[in-house]
A protein has these predicted regions:
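Active-site C-terminal subdomain of aminotransferase-like
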Residues: 1-84
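Conserved C-terminal alpha-helix-loop-beta "cap" of PLP-dependent enzymes
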Residues: 56, 63-132
Length: 133
C-alpha cells in the first residue's frame, strides 16, 4: 500500500531527499507512516527477522510447486511475489476457501505478505493452500 521506510546516515537521507524532489515525489501527511515506522524500529526491530525467515520458507516451498514460481533472489523481506501458471484470480478464490485473504496482481501474480500476526502454523497453512491448487 505505501511501500517501505528508508533508513540511513544523515548524508544518505539528504541525498535520497534530493532525488525524491527531483522526481516529484512527496507525501504531505507522511507523519502517520513515519510514526508507524519509528514504532517498529523502537519495538519490533529484533523480530522482523522472523518475518523474513517465514517469508523465505513460504517462497521456497511455493517455488517447488508445479503451478507456481518465485524469484528467490528477490525475497529479501517479508514479501513474496508468486508467479502463477494458472489464473491468479482462481488462486485467490481457492486461497479464500482456505481462509487466506489475498488479491491478484498484474501479470498473473499474487503477493504473500508475512507480518507480526503470521505464525509458523499460518505459514504451513499458506503452503498447504498453495499446494492444493
Amino acid at each position: 500500500p505505501v511501500g517501505s521506510v528508508l533508513v540511513g546516515s544523515q548524508e544518505f537521507i539528504n541525498k535520497a531527499h534530493r532525488w525524491r524532489k527531483m522526481f516529484g515525489g512527496g507525501w504531505r501527511q507522511a507523519g502517520v507512516l513515519a510514526a508507524a515506522a519509528l514504532y517498529t524500529l523502537d519495538h519490533h526491530i529484533d523480530r522482523l527477522e522472523e518475518d523474513h525467515v517465514r517469508a523465505r520458507r513460504v517462497a521456497e516451498a511455493i517455488n517447488a510447486m508445479d503451478n507456481f514460481s518465485v524469484d528467490l533472489d528477490a525475497v529479501q523481506s517479508n514479501l513474496v511475489y508468486v508467479n502463477c501458471n494458472i489464473p491468479a484470480a482462481d488462486v485467490v478464490t481457492s486461497l479464500a476457501e482456505h481462509g487466506i485473504d489475498m488479491f491478484d496482481l498484474p501479470y498473473n501474480r499474487v503477493r504473500v505478505a508475512i507480518h507480526l500476526h503470521i505464525t509458523d502454523e499460518d505459514v504451513e497453512r499458506i503452503i498447504a493452500a498453495f499446494a492444493a491448487q
